[in-house]
Amino acid sequence: MLATSAAEPLALLRQYWGHQQFRPGQQEIMEAVLAGHDALALLPTGGGKSVCFQVPALARPGICVVVSPLIALMRDQVENLRKRGLKAEAVYAGMSHQEIDQALDNCVYSKEIKFLYVSPERLLTDLFRARVARMNVGLLAIDEAHCLSQWGYDFRPPYLRIAELRALLPATVPCIALTATATGQVRQDIVEKLNFRPGYGIFTQSFARPKLSYSVLHTEDKFRRLLEVLRGVGPGKTGIVYARTRRQAEDTAAWLVQQKLPAAAYHAGLPPEQRTRVQQAWLADKIRIIVATNAFGMGIDKPDVRVVAHLDAPATLEAYYQEAGRAGRDGLYAFAVLLSGPADADSLRRQATLAHPPADVVRRVYQALANYSRTAVGGGELVAFDFDLGLFAETYRLKAVDTHHALKALEQQGFVQVTEAVNQPARVQLISNQQDLYQFQVANAQHDLLIKALLRLYGGELFVAFQPISEGALSRHLRQSTTDVVRQLRYLHSAGVLHYQPKRELPQALFTTPRYDAPQLPLDERRLQAARQLTEQQTAAVIEYAASTSRCRQQLLLNYFAEPDALACGVCDVCLAHKKARQAPPDTARLQAGLLELLRATPLLPRQVVARYPTAEAPTIASALRTLVELGQLAYAADGRLSVGATKA
């Protein structure tokens, strides 16, 4: 166990992040981890989850192994750590065996590397198991921990093997799991699946966003209402519009430009360079509105987004909460607007049905994937390959929708994995020593110019580790075609002079087990049925949220995330309508005084307070309680009860 004063984490925060204080709840989480306890941290979107494991990782000896499901998010966090002067490595699909080997070696032998990010399917390969056993691991962090639970909205079977990883580590290594979206059932699942040890803590912050106004606008003309919303937040304010399909994103962005609103589309089908340009222009406020599919937003840090609008409801409230929560992270008032049409509920139900194709379709897609990747029965485990969904479906005459959902089913059963699109530059490492390289150049004059160009443009670091290169830059330097440069690099790779990894732009797919003969694929029919039932429940929750005209929007969301005592927010469309409808509100000062007198005598849960008044006054009582909390006259205790004055959590 490491004895660490509270001052040390704060000093690290100030030194590397430049923040003067922790956000609410962060310090308690860190203290538990630094005391050697397991911890589950449930923080709202934008609540500073990464700091909760990064700071303790620096305060503890050894390296922090971070399990993360998204390549883009992993790479962003590694890049951000390196910018802060902290050393980090990452291992994920699309890297060569040599790159993975080198990254893991660095973590074994370098005491300066503090973070190793790893995608879940890489955790228990023979290579990883052998190397992690030799690492001085000080902390295990599980990002997006809801992926552990089959009841979560993004279940990923490789996460279930994290418990096996824990068995390889000393018992003194604590585990911290973090998520922004977890129902009560998912929380229990996380604790059990990670084998949390006695003394563990669950740290929850309310998912409430007091200054985020949730609204549902029922309309037959979504474009017109969208325009009203975007103009209504004020000139120059930035926003995100979420569309269901790539085509819808492009059409909506084009229409907004016609209406004199600076907008651009963003989706996974665009070339990586274009996606980067659009994202950077939006971050720099050169584009006001970004119209995106759900491929956009994860890991994006733009606190001044004033509005997030959805043209259609997402499939789950978890997804909606995360996407809507990208508005107003600066703590100022912001808006989350869902546009709902007359046929939307029926459309959601149809999509829920389509989301679970029959087993014979799933097997057919599995066989097609084997043909596409030319993978023999018994082979291909964890060998990544470029994957173009459109081309794949067209080649094997599959319906794109069925194919997408069949791949999801195969992922949830633990047979395949498809990553998001990656934009990874070509990489090279010289593996000949300088004397052997010189002799090769003398004997192979036709490759001498390319080798000299590599050394001139990228330096001696090429002998030490993989370095990103540009085939285009080499082409211009040598005045040769890019095709010729790539051909030479491939030859030098095959000749054992260097390791060459070509540029990757497409999503990566891989088999997470040795490939089965499709008819013998051991699909678990019970799990397929359970997944159907879960989707039906999630769809019903979204439909209820959109249809409600009597319950506070934020209260509905918080109840879904196991906050039964949540107060009405006072700023959503439903709460504002209730305020407007009340003709004769009670004397506010007298009501507040009565509540203070009541709670001074006996701390109570909010629902217990509300229950003491007539049902018709419930919204008024909830509003008064919220006001007293905001004024600091009431405070929450650790058990959720309200009492007068400051209370220790």
Please give the residue ranges for each predicted region.
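Residue-level signal for tight coil/turn positions that link beta-strands
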Residues: 61, 209, 504, 638-639
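C-terminal accessory/connector segments of nucleic-acid motor ATPases
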Residues: 357-515, 520-624, 633-636, 643-644
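Short, amphipathic C-terminal "tail helix"
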Residues: 630, 645-648
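Helicase motor core with emphasis on the C-terminal RecA-like subdomain
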Residues: 2-3, 7-16, 20-24, 28-40, ...
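N-terminal/domain-start segments enriched in small and hydrophobic, helix-friendly residues
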Residues: 137, 142, 147-149, 591-598, ...
